[in-house]
Amino acid sequence: MTEQFRTEKDSMGEFQVPIDAKYGASTARAVENFPISNLRFSRSFIKALGEIKKACAKVNQNNKLLNKNFAESIIDAAQQVIDGDYDKDFVVDIFQTGSGTSTNMNANEIISKIASESLSENIHPNDHVNMSQSSNDVIPTATNVAAVTEIVEKLIPNVESLIQSLEEKANYMHEIGRASCRERV
């Protein structure tokens, strides 16, 4: 079975995108241009991107830069990204040129597509989803949020578990007396 495509158009022209993909032309172009490692971003990083896009949509609505319907659709779509519903559509290699623009656009296009489908209106990836944002801010912020999340949710609990195991082992060893490398009775 051959893969089917749709034609997407952006500021750089038309591009063929897999028909079921939630991303658009910019992401598909980045995948073609930067096939470096086949490594993808972590769940915590994608979640952080969704949280940033959601927060920005709320702020843009509060500042009357984004109408309520668009904002709510973007917020709902970003929540789906946060929940991990579209991780498979984050296809840009972690190694790419620039300041993560391709990754930022990957998120913008996914959220735009989901929001546009739910609202039946055209929510633009740059003009609406990425409003008041720059890749130079979004990507480092997502990196920091993801790092803190990993530290709090994974590293600290594992270190605490290790400490507890070592304390138990130390207490056990302390109770055992040794004489000539044998346990004492």
Describe the predicted segments one by one.
Residues M1-R184:
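Conserved, well-structured ligand/cofactor-binding cores
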